[in-house]
């Protein structure tokens, strides 16, 4: 995620299973993994006491994520381990505790309806092909005003941010729009220090943005079923 708000964590990210230096890339199998394939009971890496090696040391983590069998809370914990800025990590740890009591991925019911309708329509295949595209659309559909302004500039494979006019948007919408653009283009208009400041980004908005980060990292499988 070079150039995104998480650029400061790039070196650390390369040490996590499934991430390699960007110059080398990652070889991904075309095989579509299922939950049965990733059942930890059949893992050859379990200890003699049949204990799982855990997310951090799991050699099958990329496959488990692709199969959609890594829980939302587990993805958040992995995300926290990558963060160098302590104030930011502390805020996300708070969100993790809240999510265990009140799990929610979308901003509200209207957001869920908009996004899922696009997903189910079959007219936007890049939702499943491009993590950057999916993360940006996820954010743009979260705000009624932003969606009204942007929907005509989103096609099957691209988003034309330069044509979207956001004059009149509120402060939350402003942060959502620029974070969506950052995740799509790999820019850093919204800094990680700003995301760490609760006076600029409230907890509910931060949760939405973090969920978009998870989509940017893992794709649509990050969205709980």
What annotation goes with each model-predicted range?
Residues 1-167, 189-196, 200-225:
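Extended, charge-biased low-complexity segments
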Residues 184-185:
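GHKL/Bergerat-fold ATPase module
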């Amino acid at each position: 995620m070079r150039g995104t708000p998480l650029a400061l964590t790039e070196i650390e990210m390369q040490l996590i299973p499934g991430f390699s230096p960007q110059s080398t890339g990652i070889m991904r199998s075309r095989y579509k993994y299922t939950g049965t394939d990733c059942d930890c009971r059949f893992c050859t890496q379990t200890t003699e006491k049949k204990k799982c090696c855990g997310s951090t040391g799991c050699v099958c983590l990329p496959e488990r994520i692709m199969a959609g069998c890594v829980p939302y809370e587990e993805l958040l914990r992995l995300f926290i381990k990558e963060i160098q800025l302590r104030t930011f990590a502390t805020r996300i740890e708070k969100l993790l505790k809240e999510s265990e009591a009140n799990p929610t991925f979308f901003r509200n019911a209207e957001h869920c309806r908009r996004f899922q309708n696009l997903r189910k329509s079959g007219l936007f295949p890049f939702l499943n092909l491009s993590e950057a595209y999916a993360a940006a659309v996820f954010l743009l559909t979260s705000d009624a005003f932003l969606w009204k302004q942007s929907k005509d500039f989103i096609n099957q494979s691209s988003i034309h941010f330069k044509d979207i006019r956001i004059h009149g948007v509120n402060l939350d919408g402003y942060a959502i729009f620029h974070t969506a653009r950052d995740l799509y283009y790999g820019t850093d208009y919204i800094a990680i220090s700003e995301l760490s400041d609760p006076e600029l980004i409230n907890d509910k908005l931060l949760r939405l943005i973090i969920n978009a980060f998870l989509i940017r990292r893992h794709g649509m499988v990050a969205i709980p079923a």
